[in-house]
């Protein structure tokens, strides 16, 4: 998860997050180069005497500043389209879980395990243990296997929500009357935190998500839920 004063993205826990970090670095490099060139041209303009004020035509320059931005946009767009395709790619999932957003908690349904359903509420400060994270701990965590494709079916019971876990590279809107899906494969066990990322009312800030990722062999032994 994120650390205090952290400037970079969180460590990747899924292949799609690794792709997003790579694209972020690629786009940041392009934007840094553009910013440097613009600042250099601006500094050059401010420190150079205007000796060529009578120039009315410069077709070479016009050609360059028309073609160069188009090339830069293409170089940014192609990796972006690749990542977009990967995020929408749906392979044969090993597990399907339904997540339903409410004001202001989440409901999880394990349809592959006899229709197991439970709610996940934020823990009030009075119930926190030493080492727990304020505004991020829940009473019931969603338990997921690693090294297996998991499909999350996400919807909402009332208003717009968004099921988000940054370290997994997941952010899917929960829309009333609509069932969205996202497929991911976690690569590392651990406890990972997220929050509702769509303003959904007065207690929007008190709607955390906690995913407990465990090895596939342990998960296959039977549901391991903190109920």
Curated annotation (Swiss-Prot):
Q: How does it sit in the membrane?
A: Multi-pass membrane protein
As for subcellular location, the record says: Mitochondrion inner membrane
Keyword annotations for this protein, in alphabetical order, are: Copper, Electron transport, Magnesium, Membrane, Metal-binding, Mitochondrion, Mitochondrion inner membrane, Respiratory chain, Translocase, Transmembrane, Transmembrane helix, Transport
State the Gene Ontology terms under molecular function. copper ion binding; cytochrome-c oxidase activity
Which GO terms fall under biological process for this protein?
ATP synthesis coupled electron transport
For this record, the Gene Ontology CC terms, alphabetical, are: mitochondrial inner membrane; mitochondrion; respiratory chain complex IV
Give residues annotated as binding Mg(2+). 198
Known EC number(s)? 7.1.1.9
Instruction: Say yes or no: keyword Membrane present.
Output: yes
Q: Which family does it belong to?
A: Belongs to the cytochrome c oxidase subunit 2 family.
User: Partners and quaternary state?
Assistant: Component of the cytochrome c oxidase (complex IV, CIV), a multisubunit enzyme composed of 14 subunits. The complex is composed of a catalytic core of 3 subunits MT-CO1, MT-CO2 and MT-CO3, encoded in the mitochondrial DNA, and 11 supernumerary subunits COX4I, COX5A, COX5B, COX6A, COX6B, COX6C, COX7A, COX7B, COX7C, COX8 and NDUFA4, which are encoded in the nuclear genome.
- Please report the name of this protein according to its UniProt entry: Cytochrome c oxidase subunit 2
Species of origin reads Macaca fascicularis (Crab-eating macaque)
Q: What is the lineage of its organism?
A: Eukaryota, Metazoa, Chordata, Craniata, Vertebrata
Q: Tell me the gene name.
A: MT-CO2
